[in-house]
Amino acid sequence: MRCLGLMSGTSADGVDAVLADFRGSPNHPQWDLIRHVHHPYPEALRHRVVSAGQGEPSRADQWLDLAEAITEAQAMAARSCDPHAEAVLVGCHGQTIWHRPPTSQQRGASWQLLQAPLLAQLLERPVVHDFRAADLALGGQGAPLVPKADAALLGGTKGWRALLNLGGIANLTLIPPCCGPDRDASVQGWDCGPANSLIDLAVQQFSNGTLLFDRGGAMAKAGHSDETSIRRWLQEPYFQSPPPKSTGRELFGRANLQQRLNDLGRDCSSQDAVATLTSFSAAVVAQDLEQLMQRDRIRPLELIVAGGGRHNPVLMDQLQQRCRGLQLSSSQEMGLPVEAREALVFALLAWWHQRKHPGNSPSITGATRESVLGVLVHPG
């Protein structure tokens, strides 16, 4: 069955689209990646999405306009990826505006901006959307949803495999081996903390908006990181909390960046600040892997990296230095382009919805039970 997956993440740089074919068992599907594209958001739309994700107030009509613009961008990405309308089903995550994990005092909630009926009408195909809602209703975090799909798509190794996505947020998946004493262990996964979110915001601020990200790690390469600040930041509650946990720009956005820049002090150059934030993103992942070893005695054989951060050589070098003894590789080496992984996941989640197969993992999200994810809408 050919499905189209659409994903726009916390980096808010555009829409990743994947056309894939799935067949066989839902637990261990056979799959082929047919085509993938990246459709950039126009600068004005990107700015509106980032501002909305910082909690900046807008009028009701502005929210409607933004939802429509996001939906039209998703449709353009879909048409570009699937020009001959081969897909019979579309899985669309939408654009996360706000994510609130549950607490002991408050139910969890998550808002992905999208007009799904409009998207179904524009593409003339059924659309599965609102993937987080069912897990949240069952007391879960609603995220991350990628790990269970990762295990289905990329499992089958003799040792623990770690997959790291470096988007706006860094998230880890730990896939158990297919044999040996850990073969019946559960998939693990969580959001580590910021990957590109703080780096991108800092570069945009220091360049007065002329740069959107640290291309080639140039600014970080020209600076020196403040290891004292990094060690202090790693003691913050989120980084010391065990999974399940999920986060986004609500926690690691402009306000958080400003706090860290204030902490670094006025004498810190822009290059040193970006170098520190880049090293911090790597240190967050390294600390999580070390805590995993101490907590569960799990040490993965390899760390497979995907997402836009894979193209930042300074970030990758910092990961290699801080994750000693761990072999780093790219998802590209497994036939999965680094920008395509999450869009492929939402194509799979749409297929799972059609097959009535649960898409969440309670051991990851904290939900009370498994559930089929997503809401299906048909074109009128």
From Swiss-Prot:
Sorted alphabetically, the Gene Ontology BP terms of this entry are: 1,6-anhydro-N-acetyl-beta-muramic acid catabolic process; amino sugar metabolic process; peptidoglycan turnover
State any single GO MF term. phosphotransferase activity, alcohol group as acceptor
So, what pathway does this thing act in?
A: Amino-sugar metabolism; 1,6-anhydro-N-acetylmuramate degradation; Cell wall biogenesis; peptidoglycan recycling
Positions with a binding annotation for ATP: 9-16
Catalytic activity line of the entry: 1,6-anhydro-N-acetyl-beta-muramate + ATP + H2O = N-acetyl-D-muramate 6-phosphate + ADP + H(+)
Q: In which domain of life is the source organism classified?
A: Bacteria
Pfam families reported for this sequence: AnmK
| InterPro entries found in the cross-reference section | Anhydro_N_Ac-Mur_kinase, ATPase_NBD
Give coiled-coil spans as residue ranges. Answer: none
Known EC number: 2.7.1.170
Key words, A-Z: ATP-binding, Carbohydrate metabolism, Kinase, Nucleotide-binding, Transferase
What NCBIfam families does UniProt report for this protein, alphabetically? PRK09585.2-5
Q: Which HAMAP family match?
A: AnhMurNAc_kinase (MF_01270)
Q: Which family does it belong to?
A: Belongs to the anhydro-N-acetylmuramic acid kinase family.
Q: What does this protein do?
A: Catalyzes the specific phosphorylation of 1,6-anhydro-N-acetylmuramic acid (anhMurNAc) with the simultaneous cleavage of the 1,6-anhydro ring, generating MurNAc-6-P. Is required for the utilization of anhMurNAc either imported from the medium or derived from its own cell wall murein, and thus plays a role in cell wall recycling.
Name of the protein described by the UniProt record: Anhydro-N-acetylmuramic acid kinase
